[in-house]
Regions:
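Conserved "right-hand" nucleotidyltransferase catalytic core of DNA-directed polymerases
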Residues: 1-17, 21-33, 40, 117, ...
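A short acidic-Thr-Gly-centered motif at the start of a beta-strand
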Residues: 1-2, 55-58, 428-444, 614-617
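Active-site-proximal helix-loop-helix substrate-binding element of RNase H-like nuclease domains
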Residues: 24-180, 279, 478, 483-490, ...
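Short active-site loop/helix that positions an aromatic residue
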Residues: 70-82, 99-101, 251-258, 451-466
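Conserved catalytic core of nucleic-acid polymerases
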Residues: 203, 207, 328-332, 336, ...
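Helix N-cap motif at beta-to-alpha junctions
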Residues: 636-642
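Short amphipathic alpha-helices in soluble, non-transmembrane regions
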Residues: 644-652
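Long, low-complexity, intrinsically disordered segments
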Residues: 714-736
Length: 736
């Protein structure tokens, strides 16, 4: 295997606002740096590197090494007019490797060069040149001007840029030589290989994009805008003009309507010379120190949150204090705390809070998805279709490694948000957002996700007698409704009814899984303390495996009666990814049960998508998007397409080997929103997946045919068998 360090420098004018400019056919690759590790030869090639880089990308005997390699791969394939999924070279990204070794450290090339090579990234010269011309901000934004001599004195700095790109190609190879043994020693290579395969998959998904029904989107934007206007007018008529994003204005409104809320005191200190300090300067473990004095001695509840020293105290607490004459003075800012938990705690009992929550949700959805902000990400392709080419980060979440989306963040589309619910003006904004995401022309949208994934993983990892119990229940019934089971076992369904009892069971169990304390549950779900205690005790007694497993994980991390003799400060997900408990952060150990579940869920999704991408069905079915535990695919309405979905379903069900079975249920339709699953009667499916695919496929084909045939409804009956013929469908696709 030949290793090539690789880096590009590009003119990327849209990167900050809209993502890589190649998506919008703007910008260019200025220079490509290559370091041949075998020959120890460095080169800077103009543009995208010509045949040299083309041959490297298409050789299975080569591996390219870089930092943020997916970005470079996208630009190079755009410049060479290549499909990313067709490239054959291996990929190594030292930033992704570092995310596995130490998820708390910065992953930039400069930080990695300092850590492993004891040197800096070679950017000082170019940064200085940019400043010399008064070019503000990151000098990389001005590389085009420096490359082409678009400076006041018309001087080109190509040699300096070539030296810079060569350095960026060379350093990752030398960093990888240090990282590779660490990954091997810690058993992280499987996780690393998985994530590197996902780089190619996510970049290919970005390159293809997802088709957007532009007319439907414009229609929904107009409807949402009119609804927002009505909502805003109604809000102003009740409460006046209020900036709902201003804590002070919301607090004033709460005071007017006597809505309770907390205040948060923020301590800000000054060193003797008047310099404002950072909390990190005086942070020892989880204690805050002022010079040699531990502040906890004076303020028992003081703690550090996001690098700010804070103390939760009653509203009437004094607004200023001092420690002693020889010590620094501390100014205490009495800030209202009116975040999402504050609203959750009072929205059930105070209409003003409920109205603000609704207004914020609607504003957020419309701003991000049903207005111009979303429209700026859309691109019209060569056949006139509008497409979205979003960004997908393979390891977006530092602790768990879960994928993330940006520009736009599709994870911000809620599952359900209804406006004017129960009235004739009712709108489902979540549905309106999703229904504009459609399959490729002449195809159907198939959504596939894991059924009860988090519940299954909790059962898989569960310890003790409770763990054996829940696993036996899943073995007896692979489609166990665990929330229903726990609701019945706890007596909540008998006490509160089937719907409310199941909902309470689900809320408490997920609250436990996400590490919520009792007070947080009260605020999140609008419960009083006694009711929350009653629910929590009932659920913990009925489902002891969650608490038992959480306790076992914390004991292992903290060395308290270490479970099965194990004592270590990290947990491992299914693939072997390590999630570390930092020194001095013992209080955060309660979160690691959730990290274990979320990280393993991420592993499952990635491994399922890798099975898909490495199979022949990737030539039939196209991955359009992935959000949380679901993937959206474009599938031909043909027997081949139907068969491919059945195979895809097996990939999801067999992504990892669990101690209990897991199911993945496809939903099929015209769009992301309209995708529907198998019909059920009395809890059992009354059609197979094959029947579902054929039924919905025929309905979609009939709908398409109706748009292009005579408007006389009674004239001709549609021949479903003819419409479903594979040859006819292929011809139709070629014509389009």
């Amino acid at each position: 295997m030949k290793y090539f360090g690789l880096d590009i420098e590009s003119h990327d004018p849209l990167l900050t606002d809209q993502g890589p400019s190649w998506v919008y056919s703007q910008g260019e690759v200025l220079v490509t740096g290559i370091y041949d590790a075998q020959k120890q030869k460095k080169r800077a090639l103009n543009g995208a590197g010509g045949d040299t880089v083309h041959d490297i990308l298409f050789s299975s005997a080569t591996t390219i090494v870089g930092a943020n390699i997916g970005y470079d791969l996208g630009w190079l394939c755009y410049a060479h007019k290549l499909k990313i999924k067709d490239t054959r070279c291996g990929l190594i990204d030292v930033a992704i490797a570092e995310s596995l070794i130490d998820e708390y450290q910065p992953f930039s090339l400069d930080a990695l060069a300092q850590k492993y090579l004891r040197e800096r990234k070679g950017s000082e010269d170019l940064a200085g040149i940019a400043l010399q011309y008064g070019l503000k901000g990151d000098f990389r934004k001005h590389l085009k001007a420096l490359w082409y001599g678009e400076t006041p004195d018309k001087v080109s700095y190509k040699d300096e840029i070539r030296a810079y790109v060569i350095s960026d190609a060379d350093q990752p190879v030398r960093i990888w030589e240090k990282q590779h043994p660490i990954l091997e020693e810690q058993g992280l290579m499987d996780a690393f290989i998985m994530n590197m395969k996902m780089v190619r998959i996510t970049q290919a998904m970005k390159q293809h994009g997802v088709r957007i029904d532009y007319e439907k989107w414009q229609e929904n934007c107009a409807i949402a805008s009119a609804a927002y206007k009505d909502l805003h007018e109604d809000f102003v008529s009740k409460y006046g003009e209020v900036n709902i994003n201003s804590p002070k204005q919301v607090a004033a409104l709460f005071d007017k309507f006597e809505v309770p809320y907390k205040h948060k005191l923020v301590f800000k200190g000054w060193a003797p010379e008047g310099r404002k300090f950072s909390a990190n300067d005086w942070l020892k473990g989880d204690e805050v120190w002022d010079q040699r004095k531990r502040l906890k001695e004076s303020f028992p509840n003081i703690r550090v949150v996001k690098n700010k020293i804070v103390l939760m105290v009653p509203k009437q607490y004094a607004a200023r204090t001092a420690l002693q004459a020889s010590s620094m003075g501390y100014q205490i800012t009495n800030n209202p705390s009116v975040g999402k938990f504050a609203f959750a705690a009072v929205k059930a009992t105070h209409q003003v809070a409920a109205d603000i929550v609704e207004f914020k949700q609607v504003t957020n959805i419309i701003t991000k998805f049903l207005g111009p902000n979303f429209g700026r990400f859309l691109v019209q392709d060569t056949v006139g279709d509008w497409r979205l080419h979003g960004n997908f980060d393979t390891v977006g979440a530092r602790q768990t490694g879960r994928m993330s989306a940006s520009k736009p963040n599709l994870q911000n589309i809620p599952s359900k948000t209804k406006l004017f619910e129960g009235t004739e003006k009712e709108l489902d904004l979540a549905f309106m957002c999703r229904e504009v995401f459609v399959a490729d022309r002449g195809q159907m949208f198939v959504k596939l996700d894991f059924s009860g994934q988090e519940n299954v993983l909790q059962a898989h990892f569960a310890v003790g007698a409770g763990g054996r119990l829940i696993r036996s229940m899943y073995m007896a019934n692979p489609r166990l409704d665990e929330h229903q089971f726990v609701g019945e076992r706890s007596g909540l369904i008998e006490q509160h009814g089937p719907k409310a009892g199941r909902k309470y069971a689900k809320s408490v169990r997920f609250g436990n899984a996400y590490g919520m304390q009792l007070q947080t549950m009260c605020e999140q779900f609008g419960w009083d303390k006694d009711f929350a205690e009653e629910l929590t005790n009932a659920i913990n007694d009925a489902a002891p495996w969650v608490r038992e497993t959480m306790d076992a994980i914390q004991d292992m991390l903290l060395g308290k009666n270490a479970y099965r003799g194990k004592q270590r400060r990290y947990i491992k997900t299914i693939i072997g990814r390590r999630i570390h408990l930092r020194e001095g952060n013992d209080r955060g150990a309660y979160k690691f049960y959730n990290y274990l579940i979320q990280g393993s869920a991420s592993d499952m999704m990635k491994l399922a998508l890798i099975k898909y991408a490495e199979s022949d069905i990737a030539n039939i079915v196209t991955l359009l998007l992935t959000v949380h535990d679901e993937g959206g695919f474009s599938v031909p309405i043909t027997p081949q397409g139907f068969a491919a979905v059945l195979i895809l379903q097996t990939f999801f069900c067999s992504a990892v080997e669990l101690s209990i079975p897991i199911n993945a249920d496809p939903e099929v339709g015209h769009s992301w929103a309209s995708a529907e699953g198998q019909h059920k009667t009395d809890g059992a499916f009354d059609e197979t997946v094959q029947e579902l695919l054929e039924r919905v496929g025929h309905e979609l084909l009939a709908g398409n045919a109706a748009k292009t045939t005579s408007t006389d409804d009674d004239e001709d009956e549609i021949d479903f068998d003819a419409l479903g013929d594979e040859d006819d469908t292929e011809e139709e696709g070629e014509d389009e």
